[in-house]
Regions:
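Hydrophobic alpha-helical membrane-insertion signals
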Residues: 2-12
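Active-site-adjacent substrate/metal-binding segments within catalytic domains
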Residues: 10-88
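Substrate-binding cleft and catalytic face of glycoside hydrolase catalytic domains
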Residues: 52-139
Length: 139
C-alpha cells in the first residue's frame, strides 16, 4: 500500500506544520471544481494507528508513505518542527509493531510554499535544501 502525505494526512495547519504548495493551491477558490482541499483529507495525522492496522488487515507486508517536507521544516529549511519528527516516528513505530515494513518516500510533490516563493525547483539552492531535509530524515 502506498500513500502521499498531502493526500491523506490532513492537519494542514496543526502542530507547527508549514504551508505546502498544495495547501496554497487548494485554498484558492475555483482551482478545484468543487473547492475541496486536503485540509482534513482522510485525517491520517490523527488516525494513523487505526489506518496502519487496516493496512495490515489487508495482509500487506509493506506500507509506503511520504513525508511532508513542510511538516518537518515549516519554512523548508532552518528550524526543525519536533512535532513533525515525532509524528513520523510514531508512524514508523506503529508500522513495525504491526509487522509492516515502513518504506519512506522523502518527497512526493508537496514542496514547502516558502521554498516555492524563493523559486522552488528552479533555484539552484534547492539541492542544498533537499539534501539538508533528507539528512534530517536519515537521523
Amino acid at each position: 500500500v502506498a500513500t502521499a502525505a498531502y493526500q491523506i494526512e490532513g492537519a494542514w495547519n496543526e502542530d507547527g506544520k508549514g504551508v505546502s504548495i498544495w495547501d496554497t493551491f487548494s485554498q484558492k477558490k475555483k482551482n478545484i471544481k468543487d473547492n475541496t482541499n486536503g485540509n482534513e483529507a482522510c485525517d491520517f495525522y490523527h488516525k494513523y494507528a487505526e489506518d496502519i492496522k487496516m493496512v495490515k488487515s489487508l495482509n500487506m507486508d509493506v506500507f509506503r508513505f511520504s513525508v511532508s517536507w513542510s511538516r518537518i521544516l515549516p519554512e523548508g529549511k532552518g528550524k526543525i518542527n519536533q512535532s513533525g519528527i515525532d509524528f513520523y516516528h510514531k508512524v514508523i513505530d506503529t508500522c513495525l509493531a504491526e509487522g509492516l515494513e515502513p518504506w519512506l518516500t522523502c518527497y512526493h510533490w508537496d514542496l514547502p510554499q516558502a521554498l516555492e516563493d524563493e523559486g522552488g525547483w528552479m533555484n539552484r539552492e534547492i539541492i542544498k535544501w533537499f539534501a539538508d531535509f533528507v539528512e534530517i530524515l536519515a537521523k
